Amino acid sequence: MNLPERSRFVIYAVGIFVCYFLYGIVQEKLTRGRYGEEVQTDGSVGERFTYALALVWVQCLCNYVFAKVLLTIRPQKEDTTNAGSYVACSLTYLLAMVSTNMAMRWVPYPTAVVGKSAKPIPVMILGVLIGRKSYSWTRYACVLTIVLGVILFMYKEGKVSNLPAETTLLGEVLLFLSLSMDGLTGAVQERIRAASAPSGQQMMRAMNFWSTLMLGVAMVFTGEAKEFMYFTIRHPEAWTHLSLIAVCGVLGQFFIFLMVASFGPLACSVVTTTRKFFTVLCSVLLFGNVLIARQWLGAVLVFAALFVDMLYGKKAPLATAKKPPVEGKLSEEKKLNS
């Protein structure tokens, strides 16, 4: 059954929201909980899970297996995408993730809020410059309004940074690197979509295959693979949390790649950026927390921009609409001449 485009968009977006909401809860239990009864050097009881590379590696491996099984059960036409494109996409994706995790420890709170919320901007800019994508002016305005609205909604007064200037500068450089890598990932995905139009499952399988290999090599060289293995032997109960994270992450990434394959990386970036906004807004509505005027303004901006984008944002410029037939004609002429 072929669902209308807007229905599919809503289903994918809700799937991303729900899966990563549960993912965040379980991840916090894993990374902030303690395992065992041993007394540590700082006097605390129990070990913490500190294996960031291993956590992402387990996730990527499970994502790859899930996509591989889906494609085995329901085979699709061959994916003709160049392997180098997937390698580049996987590398920029992993660099963005690592840079973000490191930057958030070394940037002041306001910078962190802006950095987390501004992801659609480099995705849009580099999608135009490298991915050869074109957007209407309405979509540019809507995306910028959504980013501004999320920043206004999520920002909290009274958080003061005590970080030294050198550390802050390093964090800002890492944050810029993270946003640049996000933009490059989106641009490469746009090129892949334009060149070979793989399905969401095919993109998920290929990107997670290369990500698993890269992370595996990094874990071996850093020694984290051995430390992670010993930790899980000492505390096998950690596998319960890891398994739950894997399930939530697999389903969440499945919806993400369906979104990227059907609507492009910019639409996916907007959905993942507004995810935290909708999570906080739901908690406000459910538990009766009070919003201040600035947060109400941010909420109005986000909803207004999403509504306008839904109505008008997908109308491409005239030049873009005429481009595919021209390219098709040129390729036909090349075939005839050859």
From Swiss-Prot:
Motif Di-lysine motif: where in chain: 334-338
Keyword Kinase in annotation: no
Free-text domain note: The di-lysine motif confers endoplasmic reticulum localization for type I membrane proteins.
Gene Ontology BP annotations: axon guidance; dendrite guidance; protein N-linked glycosylation; response to endoplasmic reticulum stress; UDP-galactose transmembrane transport
Protein keywords: Endoplasmic reticulum, Membrane, Sugar transport, Transmembrane, Transmembrane helix, Transport
Parts of the chain that traverse the membrane: 9-29, 53-73, 84-104, 111-131, 135-155, 168-188, 213-233, 244-264, 284-304
Keyword Disulfide bond on entry: no
Gene name of the record: meigo
Function, as annotated: Probable sugar transporter.
GO MF entries: UDP-galactose transmembrane transporter activity; UDP-glucose transmembrane transporter activity
Localization, UniProt: Endoplasmic reticulum membrane
Gene3D superfamilies: 1.10.3730.20
Protein family membership: Belongs to the nucleotide-sugar transporter family. SLC35B subfamily.
Protein known as: Solute carrier family 35 member B1 homolog
Lineage: Eukaryota, Metazoa, Ecdysozoa, Arthropoda, Hexapoda
Protein topology in the membrane: Multi-pass membrane protein
Gene Ontology CC terms, in alphabetical order: endoplasmic reticulum membrane; Golgi membrane
Organism: Drosophila melanogaster (Fruit fly)
